[in-house]
């Protein structure tokens, strides 16, 4: 059995991204791991995200996340309140899903409900 350890994100501004993660997760803490600024963020629920500086704009496979997804009630209001770029929305059996970009141009989506979907509730 494998156990989840952490996800990694490569961004232009590490400290600004830590502050963004604290907004999106409504809290959290972080530790600097290296002199280059590499840091580890820990969400209130214990999700670890390692944040590194992008080495090259020519390497998109080493940049950003691939559409992180969170569940949050009042998702659209949260996106608007934090001046995030709303891209579009979709319907699911449980409710609305909102797609947005953060300040680094990384696309996220927020499910506007708390119950897990059939895709990850097993």
Task: List the predicted regions and their residue ranges.
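Vicinal oxygen chelate
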Residues: 3-12, 31, 41-42, 57-122, ...
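Short N-terminal helix-initiation segments at or just after the protein's N-terminus
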Residues: 7-17, 46-50, 83-87
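Conserved active-site tyrosine of GNAT-family acetyltransferases
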Residues: 17-24, 105
